[in-house]
A protein has these predicted regions:
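Glycine-rich nucleophile elbow surrounding the catalytic serine of serine-hydrolase chemistry
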Residues: 178-188
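Active-site-adjacent alpha-helix of alpha/beta-hydrolase-fold enzymes
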Residues: 105, 318-336
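Accessory cap/linker subdomain of secreted extracellular hydrolases
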Residues: 26, 38, 88, 95-99, ...
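C-terminal, loop-rich substrate-recognition/catalytic regions characterized by aromatic stacking residues
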Residues: 24-26, 255-259, 354-649
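Alpha/beta-hydrolase fold nucleophile elbow
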Residues: 168-180
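Cap/lid segment of the alpha/beta-hydrolase catalytic domain
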Residues: 71-166, 214-215, 350-360, 490, ...
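Short beta-strand/loop motif that positions the catalytic acidic residue
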Residues: 307-309
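N-terminal cap/lid segment of alpha/beta-hydrolase-fold proteins
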Residues: 35-73, 497-503, 570
Length: 649
């Protein structure tokens, strides 16, 4: 053993050297910081007061909450939005001392909020932005998919409880409103709601991620949303960004191969939610137990609820109608209301006078906010409750561009005795004809070749990146209203068109695709589009001459023909029946127009490509699995239209 001094000498030497250095370094006076510990800015010119608080939940997690109170407010109702999209940004759309100015933007019907004198509250959900806790996409209710004692229902309850006890300017009445994911959260609030929750407005809500909202449609994966998944789930503050080096998104997705391979290339396997998507391609218990329409069908209807549906919603076109159908039969006291508007996703809070090339003759969104949303909120959130009651259903009728006030949905007219809805077959007949009514032609078929190496694009190329910034050429929200004439001439699209209409054809409700089709492969996708073909010349708006406007369209993945939870190979070259619903429509095909149906087997890159050979999980399809297939659409196929007819005397 070495002497102890030998072992400590290096340490002592180092310490002494440091001491000597400190002794030789000149000591300067400190330079005070020019940043105050807390900045108290001038607020005399502001017509609102903003407070930021961390509200504790029952498990101790604190959620970042921003409260904006009109200056001088007393006995004001509270309008709450819970969001994963950054609460701070939603009350900071502009740098201004004016309340309406800072609220004008996403998730805020600013005119209604300000005119109503409401206290605006925005909260980050757990795990996002300023809130504590762990983020789980569409966190399920406590149960088999969520063993914890907390979910969005309990978090909303705890938040409302805190708000009514800690905001002295309020009258203790709370409403909850939101769009998309933020529209899903009001639905969760309806499960065991807080007594102070007096009204809910779910707008374009996420409801069933497999059947027809964000993640799948009838089993076909919406790979266009992969950028959203990455940006939303891999960081707390959405700091990771999806990138592309391609001018055309079509090329980016083609070069990657399968959606699973693209996910691997982008590192999505690090995300728990992505791994759930990949592990649950069928409609199994994972999806069924989260479907909000199924959940709410088992709940009593106690809170007045206004569901808002956009007829050209590119993201959540299934949800609002599905919830309405689920809960309306249990509505004994007239608490369930519905709006259908001619908008894109979230379009009810924007300018609603136009949609792409379409002109509606008035600002439809402004009408809805002032004539429907404003009195609806006032009736339940104000102390006097003197606002007029709204109609059970307020539906915009496209084609005629008229608002209709109805007693229920679907309903052909305000007086349900004056008309009736009758299912009428639009036959896909020989000679590329669409024939309304009459007997089916059981002979023959139309044929096309579907090539996964050249899938049908979902819109005209080049396809801009998914996004909402029109200044950057991102027109994703309005693609459903794109002109479809480019696709009616393709050899891999079967097109059927009616004769010119001599009388109007009005439809209200859900068209049903009823295909008899075969494929030379062992799996196939079927896309059906119902289209209004404008006359070749439209004097009032020349740009609409010959326009082919999608009224309703969707996709069905053939492997689920015998059961949505049981994928099976298709029998090759055998005519098989496929029946699936298309999104709700409320439209009049006018005289001089024609009705068209397009059928195809890809819709790319909106949906991932079907390899057309059966594989256990398409996410993991290999390059050799993708093969051409010959598709036949038999003339016994039809689209069942919900036609409004005058009732028999």
């Amino acid at each position: 053993m070495k002497p102890i001094f030998a072992r400590i000498t290096p340490a002592l030497a180092f310490a002494l050297a440091g001491f000597a250095h400190a002794q030789s370094t000149p000591q300067y006076p400190g330079l005070p910081s020019e940043t105050p510990a807390e900045y108290l800015g001038p607020t005399a010119d502001f017509n609102y007061v903003k407070r930021t608080v961390m509200i504790p939940m029952r498990d101790g997690t604190r959620l970042n909450t921003i409260i904006v109170i009109p200056k001088g407010a007393k006995h004001a109702g509270i309008l709450l939005t819970r969001t994963p999209y950054d609460a701070s940004s939603q009350v900071s759309h502009a740098d201004s001392s004016d309340l309406e100015t800072i609220l004008t933007g996403y998730d805020n019907a600013a005119d209604v909020i300000v005119e109503g004198g409401y206290i605006r509250v925005i909260q980050d959900v757990r795990g996002k932005y300023g809130s504590e806790g762990d983020y789980v996409m569409n966190r399920p209710l406590h149960g088999p998919l969520n063993p914890t004692p907390v979910d969005h229902s309990t978090d909303t309850y705890d938040t409302i409880d805190w708000l009514v006890k800690n905001i002295p300017e309020s009258n203790g009445r709370v409403g909850i409103i939101g769009i998309s994911y933020d529209g899903f959260l009001p639905l969760m609030a309806l499960v065991n709601p807080h007594p102070a929750l007096k009204v809910a407005v779910p707008m374009n809500p996420m409801v069933d991620g497999w059947k027809g909202d964000d993640w799948f449609h009838n089993g076909a994966f919406r790979q266009i949303n992969m950028s959203y998944v990455l940006e939303q789930v891999v960081t707390r503050g959405n700091t990771a960004k999806w990138y592309t080096t391609n001018f055309d998104d079509y090329d980016m997705y083609m070069r990657a191969g399968s959606a699973g391979e693209l996910g691997r290339q982008r590192g999505l396997e690090q995300s728990g939610f992505w791994n759930k998507l990949v592990a649950h391609p069928a409609y199994d218990a994972f999806w069924q137990q989260q479907a909000m329409d199924k959940i709410l069908a088992r709940q009593p209807v106690t809170v007045p609820t206004l569901l808002v549906h956009s007829l050209w919603d590119a993201e959540d076109i299934y949800g609002a109608i599905a919830v309405y159908k689920a809960i309306k039969p249990h509505d004994k006291d007239g608490k369930v209301f519905l709006t259908l508007g001619p908008w894109v996703h979230g379009g009810a809070i924007e300018n609603g006078a136009t949609l792409g090339a379409l002109r509606f003759g008035s600002d439809t969104a402004l009408y809805w906010r002032q004539e429907v949303l404003k009195p609806f909120l006032a009736r339940y959130l104000k102390d006097d409750a003197s606002a007029p009651a709204i109609a059970p259903v307020t539906a915009f009728e496209t084609g005629t561009n008229q608002w209709r006030k109805l007693s229920s949905w679907p309903s052909g007219c305000a007086d349900t005795k004056a008309c009736a809805i009758k299912p009428v077959a639009l036959h896909l007949a020989a000679g590329d004809k669409a024939v309304l009514g009459g007997a089916a032609d059981d002979k023959g078929y139309e044929e096309y070749v579907s090539d996964p190496a050249k899938p049908v694009p979902f819109r005209q190329r080049p396809i801009p990146p998914y996004g909402y910034d029109e200044a950057k050429g991102q027109t994703w929200p309005r693609w459903l209203a794109d002109d479809q004439r480019e696709f009616s001439g393709r050899t891999d699209v079967a097109t059927f068109v009616s004769d010119v209409l001599s009388a109007p054809v009005k439809i209200s409700g859900e068209p049903i695709a009823s295909l008899v089709a075969s494929t030379s492969g062992t799996d196939s996708d079927w896309v059906v589009k119902l289209i209004d073909v404008y006359p070749d010349q439209v004097a009032s708006q020349p740009a609409m001459g010959g326009y082919q406007l999608m009224i309703s369209a969707d996709i069905f993945r053939g492997r689920y023909r015998e059961g949505l939870d049981k994928p099976k190979p298709l029998a090759a070259n055998k005519p098989l029946n496929y029946r699936f619903g298309l999104p709700t429509a409320n439209h009049v095909f006018l005289p001089g127009h024609r009705i068209m149906v397009q059928v195809q087997s890809s819709w790319f890159p909106l949906y991932d490509r079907n390899p057309q050979t059966f594989v256990p999980n398409i996410f993991f399809a290999k390059p050799g699995d993708y093969r051409k297939a010959t598709q036949r659409i038999y003339h016994s196929s039809f689209v069942e239209l919900p036609v409004v007819e005058a009732a028999a005397p």
